[in-house]
Amino acid sequence: MLEIKLSDVSKIISAKLYGDKNFIIKGISSIEDSKPGYISFIYKNKFRKYLPSCKASAIILAKDNLPFCKQFALVVKDPYIAYVKLVKFMYVKKIPKYRIRSTAIVSKKAILGKNIYIGHNTVIESKVKLENNIIIGSGCFIGENTIIGSNTHLWDNTTIHHGTIIGNNCSIQSGSVIGSDGFGYANKNGSWIKIPHLGKVVIGNNVEIGSSTTIDRGSIDNTVIGNGVIIDNQCQIAHNVIIGENTAIAGGVVMAGSLIIGSNCIIGGASVINGHIIICDRVKITGMSMVMRSIKTPGIYSSGVPAQLNKKWKKNTALIMNINKIKKQIKEILKKYKKK
């Protein structure tokens, strides 16, 4: 972590500074748990209530919150983006010294670029191609004929199966498995016959994948993750799924096979999406939704029942279970009314 003058902070985040330009900032704290000597930020007006009790020495905020700020202030158009810029500058990522650790097993037929770190107990199989500036943590497995682009980081205990293609500037967190066989079986006389999966997983540039996420290889064609996609922890992406550029997928999402999702979509946590359907660009699906049919129009889509008092939930569920009976009763009442 770097210590930095407020004048330098204002330059980094393109802010107008109100306060002592020579004041030294020691770090970044949240507005709720602020500390003297630290800088905090407000990106929504609902956090304005914390300003009177805030102990931070400086605040990043929008112009409309400036009258409520008694601390040194840095006014920007978008406080959240400004905060991200500052974090990236102040908290420098520690890069291990480039080397291959003694317990790593690297095939002689693997092709390694410049500045490669390979951690303990990692296995790199034949004909793997690693570009430049790659970090591979301990306990990883990279199957044969895999290609990994420059500036990509595989965290500890990541598994990349054969033939996978990963682009530049990607990050795959611990426990994730890329390129397993998909859930493909044929039923013959009541018995299941496994279908070999011949496709690959192809991941674009600037993709981030969280921990314990699984992405299956395609059955014939490839499973494709577009440029700039971000995927949270514990997501299941089945065979032949195609995800468009800059789509964000929150934790616990389950996607069935041959689903196509457009670009710039947001999929809320724990949503379940049917296979063999198409979701167009710029769709937002709220958390815990179940999507059964294609979505052809951009917008916000929801399903499911939010939590409520148990008594109320039981009554509402009883009404839903009896909806057809209630419908018939209403029809009978309307018939009698019309006769009058």
Curated annotation (Swiss-Prot):
Its EC number is 2.3.1.191. It is an enzyme of class 2 (transferase). The keyword Lipid biosynthesis applies. InterPro entries: Hexapep, Hexapep_transf_CS, LpxD, Trimer_LpxA-like_sf, UDP_GlcNAc_AcTrfase_non-rep. The active site is at H239 (proton acceptor). Pathway: Glycolipid biosynthesis; lipid IV(A) biosynthesis; lipid IV(A) from (3R)-3-hydroxytetradecanoyl-[acyl-carrier-protein] and UDP-N-acetyl-alpha-D-glucosamine: step 3/6. It catalyses: a UDP-3-O-[(3R)-3-hydroxyacyl]-alpha-D-glucosamine + a (3R)-hydroxyacyl-[ACP] = a UDP-2-N,3-O-bis[(3R)-3-hydroxyacyl]-alpha-D-glucosamine + holo-[ACP] + H(+); UDP-3-O-[(3R)-3-hydroxytetradecanoyl]-alpha-D-glucosamine + (3R)-hydroxytetradecanoyl-[ACP] = UDP-2-N,3-O-bis[(3R)-3-hydroxytetradecanoyl]-alpha-D-glucosamine + holo-[ACP] + H(+). GO terms for biological process: lipid A biosynthetic process. The keyword Magnesium does not apply. It holds the Pfam family Hexapep. One of its GO terms (cellular component) is membrane. Keywords: Acyltransferase, Lipid A biosynthesis, Lipid biosynthesis, Lipid metabolism, Repeat, Transferase. One of its GO terms (molecular function) is N-acyltransferase activity. PROSITE patterns: HEXAPEP_TRANSFERASES. Homotrimer. Belongs to the transferase hexapeptide repeat family. LpxD subfamily. Catalyzes the N-acylation of UDP-3-O-(hydroxytetradecanoyl)glucosamine using 3-hydroxytetradecanoyl-ACP as the acyl donor. Is involved in the biosynthesis of lipid A, a phosphorylated glycolipid that anchors the lipopolysaccharide to the outer membrane of the cell. This is UDP-3-O-(3-hydroxymyristoyl)glucosamine N-acyltransferase. The gene is lpxD.
